[in-house]
Amino acid sequence: MVSMSTTGNAHTENVQHRLTVETVEIAPNTTAIRCLDWDRDRFDIEFGLQNGTTYNSYLIRGEQTVLVDTSHQKFRQLYLETLKGLINPKAIDYIIVSHTEPDHSGLVEDVLQLAPRATVLASKIALQFLEGLVHDPFSKRIVKSGDRIDIGKGHEIEFVSAPNLHWPDTIFSYDRKTEVIYTCDAFGMHFCDNRTFDEDLEAIEADFRFYYDCLMGPNARSLLNAMKRMGDLGKIKIIANGHGPLLYHHLDVLTECYQSWSQRQAKSETTVGLFYVADYGYSNLLVQAIGEGIQKTGVAVEMIDLSTAEIQEIQELAGRAAGLIIGMPPTTSVAAQAGISSLLSVVKDKQAVGLFECFGGDDEPVDTIRRKFIDLGVKEAFPAIRIKDVPGASAYQLCTEAGTDLGQLLTRERNIKQIKSLDVNMEKALGRISNGLYIVTTKKGDVSSAMLASWVSQASLQPLGFTIAVAKDRAIDSLMQVGDRFVLNVLEEGNYQELKKQFLKRLHPGADRFAGVRTQTAKNGSPILTDALAYMECEIQSSLECSDHYILYCTVEDGRVSKPDGLTAVRHRKVGNYY
């Protein structure tokens, strides 16, 4: 039985996950309806930091009333009660649907039943999607860049087309009176907090970056175009996003981050095109995971929805990309089938192609598509990813590792050139810095990973802490975020070769890194290597981005030495341009 309690203007639903709704006046005649999901963990790849999330909706009241987006279905009762407490829904004149992803449009049909005379304002593609979601006829109007509506009392709302952020149907909406822009997923973050605005930059910056890397980075070119259009609107006081705190206190800093990160992506020497069908099966989540793995290696990615993109747009990206990732489309999608045919017509034998199933119930057979590419002489980026059940954490790990393998393949020659370009004397001098040999092991849910490490150094006495350098292109990176726990296994001099060999093996994506290795389980759930000299259970406290590595500061929570007289294995190098 679900019980509900009310305090002021916030409702609480006492279920397994804490769900609350808050209303806040953010500007004249403008109310934010923030649905707070305190315990949301990793269901999408972008929830990796596990700090919950919010679903933000907005009410603008002039002489007419506008509702900007709705919320997730899980908030149905709470959201609708809150909305009714703010306004008679029959008074709503317009519902702006920024895009049709279910966490923002999941309650559009419910609101339309309460506000039958409201007109839905959305992009052409969004309205096509909505017609499949809303079962009764509704009033609708297509909006695009430059279109405006005047709702009175000075509130004139101008629209900006922002396709592929991160869905193909996205629009922004700018209120000229309040200078508030409503951006849905863009400039958001998965961070749940009672503070409406971005008061504490340090608290949110890791989540802000993680969210960008997962959702916005794959569409850096589209984001730069959208930001250029934003610049033409005039002054922006508040970015009212769809997830997390609204941007106000640090708006300039955070938008500059988006600008610089996106410019870096757009200037990348190497690009992989990700071709999929939005909102079909698990294509969105799977392609995000593959894209995350690719981006770890410094390779840029660009995403295109095969069902909505123009043929020339598909061919333009395919023609300049070093690699192509293709999610199997439904056999019934004529547009997606045409998109696949257009890819086959421009693909080159020097490109690498990776295929994945979407578990949508009507996938095009992956072997049929695979054979067509092989017959053209195209090499496979990785074995086709076959999804035979609802994908879980292990499936997403498989996708991330496959993406990382492809990125490393595409950057191998570039990295070799960079290594050879270093000053010989300088690299020899740097190589005289020696370190111990360690193996980092970690497990989160059903996903486990490990890596050989040598760049480890004690950093504090109270508390006991050390730093460890983790390359950005390591598969373990997604399990080594601030707040994550792991085990640092110390290898023993004279007794480390077998473990070193095991954890240096290049395995197929998804393979069990611990196969044949004796382990025990630490208190924090991570594997302890039985044959290690010592181990420490650790927690990551902070992270510093340094070019091609992250420097993690970690504290020690527990530890033990198995051989008191043993010595730590040491890695001696002659040059400093590799491990």
Curated annotation (Swiss-Prot):
Catalytic class of the enzyme: oxidoreductase
Cofactor: Fe cation
Cofactor: binding comment: Binds 2 iron ions per subunit.
Keywords: Electron transport, Iron, Metal-binding, Oxidoreductase, Transport
Domain of life per record: Bacteria
Gene3D superfamilies (alphabetical): 3.40.50.360, Electron Transport, Fmn-binding Protein, Chain A (2.30.110.10), Ribonuclease Z/Hydroxyacylglutathione hydrolase-like (3.60.15.10)
EC number: 1.-.-.-
Positions of the Flavodoxin-like domain: 272-460
Signal sequence, start to end: none
CDD domains: flavodiiron_proteins_MBL-fold
Binding-site positions, Fe cation 1: 99, 101, 166, 185
Annotated Fe cation 2 binding sites: 103, 185, 243
Pfam families xrefs: Flavin_Reduct, ODP
A GO term for molecular function: FMN binding
Keyword Transport in annotation: yes
Region (Flavodoxin-reductase-like): 461-579
Stretches for region Zinc metallo-hydrolase: 50-243
Entry similarity comment: In the N-terminal section; belongs to the zinc metallo-hydrolase group 3 family.
More details: By homology with NorV in E.coli, could be involved in nitric oxide detoxification.
Function: Mediates electron transfer from NADH to oxygen, reducing it to water. This modular protein has 3 redox cofactors, in other organisms the same activity requires 2 or 3 proteins.
The protein's name: Putative diflavin flavoprotein A 2
Source organism: Nostoc sp. (strain PCC 7120 / SAG 25.82 / UTEX 2576)
Taxonomic placement: Bacteria, Bacillati, Cyanobacteriota, Cyanophyceae, Nostocales
